[in-house]
Structure formats: structure tokens, C-alpha cells
Curated annotation (Swiss-Prot):
This is Forkhead transcription factor fkh-6. GO terms for molecular function: DNA-binding transcription factor activity, RNA polymerase II-specific; RNA polymerase II cis-regulatory region sequence-specific DNA binding; sequence-specific DNA binding. The keyword DNA-binding applies. It comes from Caenorhabditis elegans. Keywords: DNA-binding, Nucleus. Probable transcription factor. Binds to the DNA sequence motif 5'-[TA]TGTT[TG]T[TG][ATG]TT-3'. Regulates sexual dimorphism in the gonad, promoting male gonadal cell fates in chromosomally (XO) male animals, yet plays a role in gonadogenesis in both sexes; probably acts downstream of terminal regulator of sex determination tra-1, to control early gonadogenesis. Positively modulates expression of homeobox protein egl-5, probably acting indirectly, during early gonadal development. It is found in: Nucleus. InterPro entries: FH_FOXL2 (IPR047515), Fork_head_dom (IPR001766), FOX_domain-containing (IPR050211), TF_fork_head_CS_1 (IPR018122), TF_fork_head_CS_2 (IPR030456), WH-like_DNA-bd_sf (IPR036388), WH_DNA-bd_sf (IPR036390). It comes from the Eukaryota.
């Protein structure tokens, strides 16, 4: 039994040098070798010989690099659908013995621009191998989607889908007249789902806070004094009326009541209660609970500086000093 000849019976023009790698992929190298053969077929060893004869970069490579590019050639022949293996006797099925021919598939061969193997056109195989119909070039987007996936077969696509506004499906058509409004209300009443926007869900999900201040610390307001027929307006009453007309510092609490409570309450208690009342269930991440008790004394003292001053902690309201 003689070994198959690996001599190439045609002339090969050398290209490149042994330093620069040729700008071709392994698929292009295989296609170049098979296309140069008169019979348009080659064995694996003949493909090796063609690549070595044409490109000194692969011929002059060391043993490790030579084994690497030869393995890549074998992998591309076995895994790429562009190439098929034929037996030497011409049968359709190739045997497991060495010396089989490799040739390109006529309907699935790699396409190149006028023999320029540097710029390879990748032929997309579509979805035909997955069990669906292949995509055909058509102007109707609906036809393309119906051929790609069976899920879109039952959908009715508009004819002008390519020129439509992409956000048109997400826009609500408001009625332009009283007649359109009446027709829209009839359609909404007949259907199970209404297109109107219900804002009550936000009211229930996000309740509006009435106050950030614990009103338990505020002293109850005094009952109004009984005024005689001859009303004498003292100076204190005038000041009180001015305070009443002022804008409350805290929502829900009048200015007079708030200022009166400040004079009767320890500022440190108000400051601590504000932190505790703000970090409620409604605002769990508003403030962290205090690490230490606010009634403790500082370990370091500074002349002319009071740590009980609320302005040191970022509060704008200046509370009067405790007596």
C-alpha cells in the first residue's frame, strides 16, 4: 500500500515573508488552496503543502507554531459548514481512513470579492437550521417577523410600520371634542379595563406627612380671656396678634403655641425628640438613631463653645438656652 502523493501538480506564487503574518483567516487559506486546485478538491496534507509553499511565514515556523496553525486548519475543516469531506473513490460518504478529499459546498461556499480573500463576506445562515423558515428579503416588516418566529404569525402589523413613530404605541389618544369624549367614555365603560389614570393609588401608597414634630411636647394653648365691653388693647396683645399672622415654623402648629412651648421645654429634649420622631416607620432611613444619650456631658470642653447649641448639628432654628 503506497502513501498518497502530496506533490502539488500546479505552480504556486509565493507571497509575503517569514516575519509578517499573512492577513488571511484560516477559512480563507483553506478556500484559497482548494480554489487553486484544478479539481477543486484537496487532501489535508495537500492543503498543508499549499499553505507552506505560498506563505513563508507558515513554512519557516518552529515546531510549536507549526503544530498550532495545522490544528487550526483541521478544526476549521471539521467545524465549518463551508467544507465537506469526500472519499477518494468518489462516494458520497467519506470513510474514517486518511487521505479523504476536502471540497467546498456549492450552495454554502465562502464568498469573496473577485478572488480577494482578505475581505471575506460572511454568509449568514439564518434560522433555517433551528427548525424555522429562512429570512427572505422583503419590504414588509410583518412578513419578515412572521417568517422568523411562529409567535408573530397571529399579529396584525400595520402597512406603514417602517415610517411610523416608534413611540406611537405608547401614546394615549386624548379626545379632541365633546363627541370624541362621549365616545371614549362609552368605550371605556363597555370594556373591562379603563384607560384613565387613577391617582388614588399614590395617595394610599405615599401618605402625605402632616408634621415632623412631636406635638406631645407642645404645651396646650390657653383659653382666650374674657374681654369686657370696653376693650382695652394692651401692648402684649398687639405683639401676640403679630405673631399669629406670622407663618408657622412647623406645619400644623401656630407660631404663638410653638414659641410658648419653646420657653417651657428644655431645648435638648426638643432636639432629641425631633430625631426620634423623624426616624419613624414612614421615613426609616431619614436619620440614624442617636448612638449616645443626649444628656451626657462632653468629655472635652472648649472656652466659649457650648455643645448644646443646636446650630452645631445643622439646625437653623436657634433655641433659647435652658435656664
Amino acid at each position: 500500500m503506497t502513501r498518497h502523493q502530496t506533490h502539488l501538480p500546479f505552480h504556486i506564487v509565493q507571497e509575503g515573508n517569514s516575519i509578517d503574518k499573512p492577513p488571511y483567516s484560516y477559512v480563507a487559506l483553506i478556500a484559497m488552496a482548494i480554489d487553486a486546485s484544478p479539481d477543486k478538491r484537496m487532501t489535508l496534507n495537500q492543503i498543508y503543502k499549499f499553505i507552506e509553499a505560498k506563505f513563508p511565514y507558515y513554512r519557516d515556523a518552529d515546531a510549536k507554531r507549526k503544530q498550532g496553525w495545522q490544528n487550526s486548519i483541521r478544526h476549521n475543516l471539521s467545524l465549518n459548514d463551508c467544507f465537506v469531506k469526500k472519499a477518494r473513490d468518489g462516494q458520497s460518504c467519506a470513510n474514517d481512513r486518511k487521505g479523504n478529499y476536502w471540497q467546498m459546498v456549492a450552495d454554502n461556499a465562502p464568498q469573496f470579492d473577485n478572488g480577494n480573500f482578505k475581505r471575506r463576506r460572511v454568509k449568514r445562515l439564518g434560522i433555517g437550521k433551528m427548525g424555522y423558515a429562512n429570512t427572505t428579503e422583503t419590504t414588509e416588516t410583518g412578513t419578515i417577523l412572521q417568517q422568523q418566529l411562529p409567535f408573530f404569525n397571529g399579529l396584525k402589523w400595520p402597512q406603514n410600520i417602517q415610517t411610523m413613530d416608534p413611540f406611537q404605541f405608547f401614546k394615549f389618544q386624548y379626545p379632541n371634542s365633546i363627541t370624541d369624549s362621549a365616545n371614549t367614555s362609552q368605550i371605556n365603560n363597555s370594556s373591562s379595563s379603563s384607560s384613565s389614570f387613577d391617582t388614588s393609588i399614590y395617595t394610599s401608597a405615599f401618605p402625605i406627612p402632616t408634621s415632623h414634630f412631636d406635638t406631645n411636647l407642645v404645651a396646650p394653648s390657653q383659653p382666650p380671656p374674657v374681654v369686657s365691653d370696653v376693650e382695652v388693647v394692651p401692648s402684649d396683645t398687639v405683639k401676640e396678634e403679630v405673631l399669629v399672622d406670622m407663618k408657622p415654623l412647623i406645619p400644623g402648629i401656630s407660631s404663638t403655641t410653638f414659641l410658648t412651648s419653646l420657653q417651657m421645654t428644655d431645648p435638648r429634649s426638643i432636639e432629641q425628640q425631633q430625631l426620634l420622631s423623624t426616624a419613624s416607620n414612614m421615613y426609616p432611613n431619614a436619620f440614624m438613631p442617636p448612638y449616645t444619650n443626649w444628656s451626657c456631658q462632653p468629655t472635652t470642653t472648649f472656652t466659649g463653645l457650648s455643645f448644646d447649641d443646636p446650630s452645631l448639628y445643622g439646625y437653623g432654628q436657634q433655641f433659647p438656652a435652658s435656664s
